[in-house]
Amino acid sequence: SLLLGCGLPGGMMGSMMADLGGIRQTINNLRKKKGEPELSMDDMLVKLFDEVAYVWPRVGYPPLVTPFSQYTKNIALMNLLTMEQGKGRFVMMDDNMWGMILGKSGKVPGKIDEELVALAKKQGREFTDVDPHTLLKDSLDDFRKEMDENGWEYGQDDEELFELAMHPEQYRNYKSGQAKKNFLA
């Protein structure tokens, strides 16, 4: 029921527990200096779930799928640390977290909390409602050129072209024979 309350997917438990272990050590060092009792892993897990439940609506209820579930969890995790340091919430957020909040990955379904809107303005960050797909360069012609230069066939229905476009490194290794060498090594 703890996972249901905060909304995080169960598949995140492994990485979340690893992240929590490192932060727990830092938080317990801070608590020790203040003469406060250490927190168990169970205590930290409950605190994290509670903080995710606090953060999620404030960042606009992003869908809790990769990468947004990680960003939401990371904001909550950093909040636990910065609150223990006496700095408050939303102090340590990287560009990926801000990108989600600002709309650079698309519009989140809910409203961004006024505290975060004010913090973004204070930091000189700008919200956008531009469709992020319109910012991507159309690279298909570059991949066509590469295939032509290498004498590679496009394949039926351009399937080879699309394979190169979707997995360039793996495709190049396959065509050069490097993938087979790596497999047999």
Spans of model-derived segments:
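Terminal or standalone catalytic/regulatory effector modules within metabolic enzymes
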Residues: 2-185
